[in-house]
């Protein structure tokens, strides 16, 4: 009986699965625009969804889309106008979501 109980315990236990790893390249150093991402990382929301997210702030803010296009990152934060220009230049990029719904680019006089 003890052997059967042990067998059932091991076969009925939920399988442990490794988290999917991904790299998220920010558009600049960490700032308030990235609040939802940082909160999700700190509170463990990514981990709850089976994601192990590495967040990287670039040395050059123009690099993240290029790095994703080259396969050196999974997601990049960029600006919509820049995305249109990069696609026109032939980079294989696709917009998959919105972090900040209102553009933060403006001209002040």
Annotated model-derived regions:
Residues 21-109:
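Short, glycine-/small- and polar/acidic-enriched structural segments
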Residues 1-5:
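Positively charged n-region of N-terminal signal peptides that target proteins for export
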